[in-house]
Amino acid sequence: MSASINNVINVTLLEEGRAAARDNINVCAILTSQTGVLSTAERWRSYKSASAVEQDWGASSVTAAFANVFFGTSPNPVSAGGTLIVGYWNAAGETLPATSGVLRGGEISQAVVLPALREKSDWSFSIEIDGTKHDVTEINGMTATTLADVIAQIQAKITPDVASVVFDGSRIAITNKSTGTNSVVGYPTVLDGGSFIGDLLAVAEGSGASLVNGSASTEISPETQLESLSKLKAQVNVKGAAFIDKILDAQVPLIASWAKANAVIVYETFTGSAALEVDPTNPAWAVTLASQSNFRMLYSKTGNRKFGVSYMARTHTVNFNGERTAITLHLKTMNVPAESYEQTEIDKAKRVGLDIYTTIKDVPCVLSSGANDFVDNVYNLMAYVDAVQTDSFNLLKTTPIKVPQTYYGVDQLEDCVEKTTHGFVKAGVFNPGTWTLPDFFGDRDMFLRNIEQNGYYVLAGDLKDQSTADRQERKSPVVQVAVKNAGAVHSADIIINFNK
């Protein structure tokens, strides 16, 4: 035989590691207290269309009505790769029904088990259900064409009013028909006479099977709106959220603080004249005073809470990979009726930090207040921070070797941040301009020149200035970034000189 080429040439393939995806900034949640579909056991479902919501909740349900507003807003998050999450708020408490005892078999393959079953016609076992012994005999495997044929024979012996016997494609489950703490299913045992089938079907003790006893009905106490948000966020990474029900005044400061800490934008619609007042007892004004900009506040004179859902849907529509895709909500059209406001109400709403939906020259439009910052600033920066963090992580993660702790390695990290930031310049979030803050880092002239020419400046610290401890911990020098916001024109003063 000829000699192996490995005697001369050896090749090692260094594959690229799997990268992490950026957060989907356009995943939005509507939280409902409507029961019957979701519960504390199933807290959320995702939807891409209004019809899917109607199918689950009913066309005349309040949840479907709010979802129709969400999907009827154009564009909406689905058009930008997002989705609607309907989350559950356990507002009134919940009664969990009693459960049944169940025997869950180990995983089996029909292709492996069926040939063995066909060798005998006298399979048997004995099983106790609620303390009563049930003998299962004369299971004929020789006539079985599928495993379902054997399951049907077992079910005929253990009648359906006692327990159900089901094969789900990978394992067998025997579920007691009774419920409560006394609902018990035991492991199958060997029966005198016949061939024991328990091990072959992986339902015997020691075969990978497990027992779960039934439980009594359980009362679950009501939860706060903050608790429901927190539990939803733990299960699905929502970036926008709005409640169908009014957020209680006492919950507003708690949720506003939570939203900032958890990178979620919460949308709430206020109503009533008190919400327009500059008063510490006004929860909307208190949010503005605390600069809790992740809590977006809207005002509806008629108390139309669907305004918040449409506003959320219109906000979360940006694809930051595109060019000039960034938006402002000012003057945008919502999927709710516009309302009439006096100038005094408009001025008060603007001061407090409430956006309203009205008409100008019979054209419906949003009037935005920047008192608690503008929603696009919050949304854009949330996306940018995640992008920088994720892209920098991927630089370290995907290399099959390493990013060295050298000037070359630090330059790689610096270049990565610059590339990400440039993408947000392209999208219209940042833009070249004049730096108006007194703060700067590095060489001042270079700093200002980069801001004016590029809209950003990225600078990594010098390795020679790094502490021994950081060096030994394999940390990179600090990377600093300055970005110039592109902003948006919301109003203008025009002077006309007329010569007669």
Where are these regions (language model features)?
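Short, isolated positions in well-ordered beta-strands
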Residues: 134-136
